[in-house]
Amino acid sequence: MAHKKAGGSTRNGRDSESKRLGVKRFGGESVLAGSIIVRQRGTKFHAGNNVGCGRDHTLFALADGKVKFEVKGPKNRKFISIEAE
């Protein structure tokens, strides 16, 4: 009699969808107001001049201009600002 033994089960085979986080506009790039600059979890980057912070910590431009990355303060925090053109 032809028999096939039953296959075993597995506990793998799933993964979460990627969230597409990261820097979307780099230093020196021109942006329009409302443009997303960084998508992040927590505040890896902080909002500087003319930059807003969304409730998921997304940083976005509040004015047209050029993106500027800078490190400030005693804790060497990374700030992102928009310099008006």
Swiss-Prot record:
Gene Ontology molecular-function annotations: structural constituent of ribosome
Statement: the UniProt record of this protein carries the keyword Ribonucleoprotein: yes
PROSITE patterns attached to this UniProt entry: RIBOSOMAL_L27
Keyword hit for Ribosomal protein: yes
Keywords assigned by UniProt, alphabetized: Ribonucleoprotein, Ribosomal protein
InterPro entries, per the entry: Ribosomal_bL27 (IPR001684), Ribosomal_bL27_CS (IPR018261)
Region entry Disordered, spans: 1-21
Top-level division of the source organism's lineage: Bacteria
SUPFAM superfamilies: Ribosomal L27 protein-like
Gene Ontology cellular component list: cytosolic large ribosomal subunit
Family matches, as Gene3D superfamilies: 2.40.50.100
GO biological process, one term: translation
Family: Belongs to the bacterial ribosomal protein bL27 family.
Name recorded for this polypeptide: Large ribosomal subunit protein bL27
Organism: Photorhabdus laumondii subsp. laumondii (strain DSM 15139 / CIP 105565 / TT01)
Gene: rpmA
